[in-house]
């Protein structure tokens, strides 16, 4: 690739020096739908395989695949991939700047497939940590991180809807891979399951990466990793929301199949539980995106996060049969993935489009620890108490805590709107000092307690 080609291959995790992206000139469609579909398929063949680790985990725990490995080790091997994916965000940013977005994603597609082949050759638990943990996380990160912010370049009014469709690919991929992985393991064995996943994902990811384009051709010359955001209260609220969401989300992703085994379901039934959870996400994410564009992204994020917490506390704790657990997995899947749909649009709305790259880069690194620790914490609670109740309570309250962060963020955003309106009116001479004081003192409290599209 020539220097000129590198310059024309921008990365969504970088801030261009010239021609910064603006919301006004986004096409809100056109080739953006091709990009959205391509990103959805990439998500399906990266995040979908990652979600299928719940089936691998249930198999490992049931069969004792690796001598001396504990439940905590098995859980950590899978969740490590997510932590690695997020913590390499600065590296993915540098690669995309130097090589371009497309070559970076192609590298990720190859690395991810190699990691699955290596996992098929694993004979010790530390082999699994290096292959399906570290190496898979690197590959998935190089695929996901450069592509995530691209959707916001192509859409304005339909941004959350398009983002929901793209992220729904992870749900469909998780559904397909969970069912397929369970069937392949039962009929062909663990080794072939890994190798088939490697081949299929390589073909899909490479093809779709070649179709993905960014809109801004200016050379990106500085890293979008602005730590000054960490001193902004609104951004800290977003980080808090993300951390609590990840602590709950990956417990659901990785432990539902094992919970099915614990309550006495067979391996075929157990593999259907995470599959239906991902089906719920595939259905729910575009709907959440559409509703978010219509009624407010922060509003829907609060409602969906709180609803997920209540569903976990009300249904999962009482799910002791196949039918009830299947229903819970499908229903909670509709709302559990709201973070992935709305985090980018919320960052744009609260921090501005020019801070999206910085916000995402810092966010992914900050999410590494909670994403890695979530499933091991839940399984450690289970093995320590002999019951899933503690893990279920932990998961439910994490979602409720995330909803609290979003509610406070909503109050902050409304307050900012009121202040901006008062300042604008004061500048134009349309209000006096008493009206300004009244708006600041009373309007904020009243508006925070009533419905407003945010």
Task: Report each predicted region and the residues it spans.
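C-terminal transmembrane helical hairpin of 12-TM major facilitator-type secondary transporters
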Residues: 263-265, 269, 275-288, 292-346, ...
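Intracellular juxtamembrane helix-capping segments at the cytosolic ends
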Residues: 60, 133, 140-155, 162-163, ...
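Intracellular terminal tails of multi-pass secondary transporters
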Residues: 1-42, 190-224, 349, 356-358, ...
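Interfacial helix-cap and linker-helix signal at transmembrane-aqueous boundaries
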Residues: 60-61, 65, 95-96, 176-189, ...
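Hydrophobic core of transmembrane alpha-helices in multi-pass small-molecule transporters
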Residues: 38-40, 44, 112-116, 126-146, ...
